[in-house]
């Protein structure tokens, strides 16, 4: 069986930094357990911006500097990063376009499970990107291992993914 877990953007700035929430802090132990007990390969994405972030389209719409390469906020949460066995997939947009190449290199994939932050931005973006390129692979979102910008937007994102034939578990 070739199952993959994708841990999306579990970075300090999204947990308790510039864009942190109490919901994000609360899922860290759950995500740690998920990683420790996952029977397959675990991949991590990492939101990565440069000093010119505020000049980018995203920066103009979300004018909060975050996940600037090399900063403490950019780092994957220490207790999760300690479990990482592969290079993090750095991404400069909500969806990791380079994730497709990483997944294409896998010999066999039976399912892909997602967890992480933020449900309503980067999790849903990466789930839908993966769904577009790998429509026959079952995709799963572990809702207990996700948090959104707000609880309502988290729920909205979960519902949107369900409509797109993504299995949502542990709501």
State each model region's role.
Residues 1-88, 140, 155-162, 167-170:
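Active-site acidic carboxylates
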Residues 22-25, 120, 148-150:
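Active-site glycine- and acidic-residue-rich loops that bind
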Residues 31-37, 124-134:
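Histidine-anchored nucleotide/phosphate-binding helix
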Residues 47, 94, 144-146:
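Active-site beta-loop-alpha junctions enriched in small/polar residues
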Residues 70-121:
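Internal catalytic-core helix/loop-beta-alpha segment
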Residues 98-100, 149-153:
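Short, charged, surface-exposed secondary-structure boundary motifs
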Residues 113-117, 136-151, 171:
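A short glycine-rich beta-strand->turn/loop micro-motif centered on a GG-aromatic cluster
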């Amino acid at each position: 069986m070739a199952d993959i877990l994708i841990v999306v953007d579990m970075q300090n700035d999204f947990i308790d930094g510039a864009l942190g929430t109490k919901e994000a802090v609360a899922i860290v132990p759950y995500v740690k357990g998920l990683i420790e007990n996952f029977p397959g390969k675990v991949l991590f994405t990492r939101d990565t911006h440069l000093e010119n972030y505020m000049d980018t389209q995203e920066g103009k719409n979300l004018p909060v500097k975050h996940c600037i390469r090399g900063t403490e906020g950019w780092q994957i949460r220490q207790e999760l990063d300690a479990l990482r066995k592969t290079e993090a997939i750095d991404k400069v947009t909500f969806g990791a376009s380079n994730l497709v190449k990483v997944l294409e290199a896998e010999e066999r994939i039976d399912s892909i499970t997602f967890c992480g932050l933020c449900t309503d931005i980067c999790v849903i973006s990466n789930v839908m990107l993966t769904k577009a390129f790998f429509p026959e692979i079952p995709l799963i979102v572990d809702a207990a291992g996700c948090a959104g910008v707000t609880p309502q937007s988290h729920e909205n994102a979960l519902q949107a993914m369900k409509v797109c034939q993504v299995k949502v578990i542990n709501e």
